[in-house]
């Protein structure tokens, strides 16, 4: 086992996922959803706590897994969850109920993110999590940066694409989009950007405005 593999295994096995999130994960997998890993979940919870987030948007519910992690870090926040799959939103509602999240802390919007995001108020949110339609990830991140206030954060899990992004031979549409997103955000004066290798990877962007 390589050092990287050993580190990844240690991180994966050291994270204790709360029971409500573990149940939501099991249900998500039954539905064919692809929830974020516990490693990424724990990381976004820490980021939500560190920012003191009060208003969060997630694009793609993961049947409730990502939302529960975000609210674990920022229980004071109101979460807006957007998904085109009614069944996934229903599962998220049930997961939030099981976790005793107050109904006032979450709102669920059924629809295509490409249709919903342009209607949302700019500079009104602390965090936007992008975890849907990877072929549209660049557009969604642009919307996310419009929606967050200065100092707000846009988070993109799965950014390493299962190792494909680091392999220059891989040139499929999704891998190329992830690779371009990482490169463009590193060069942008509008954001501070970093990539974490935890779980399936997490791109973290902080809006700082044009210099």
Language model features with spans:
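A short alpha-helical cap/connector motif
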Residues: 1-127, 134-155, 159-211
């Amino acid at each position: 086992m390589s050092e990287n593999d050993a580190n990844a295994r240690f991180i994966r096995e050291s994270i204790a996922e709360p029971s409500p999130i573990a149940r939501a994960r099991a249900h998500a997998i039954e539905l064919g959803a692809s929830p974020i890993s516990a490693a990424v979940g724990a990381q976004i919870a820490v980021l939500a706590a560190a920012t003191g987030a009060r208003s969060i948007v997630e694009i793609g519910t993961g049947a409730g897994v990502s939302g529960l992690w975000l609210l674990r870090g920022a229980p004071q926040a109101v979460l807006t969850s957007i998904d085109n799959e009614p069944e996934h939103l229903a599962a998220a509602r049930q997961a939030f109920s099981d976790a005793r999240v107050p109904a006032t802390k979450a709102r669920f919007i059924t629809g295509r993110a490409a249709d919903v995001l342009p209607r949302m108020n700019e500079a009104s949110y602390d965090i936007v999590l992008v975890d849907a339609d990877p072929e549209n990830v660049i557009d969604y991140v642009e919307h996310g940066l419009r929606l967050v206030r200065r100092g707000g954060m846009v988070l993109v899990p799965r950014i390493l694409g299962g190792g494909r992004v680091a392999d220059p031979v891989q040139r499929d549409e999704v891998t190329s989009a992830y690779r371009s997103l990482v490169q463009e955000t590193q060069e942008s004066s509008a954001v501070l950007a970093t990539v974490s290798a935890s779980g399936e990877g997490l791109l973290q962007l902080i809006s700082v405005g044009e210099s």
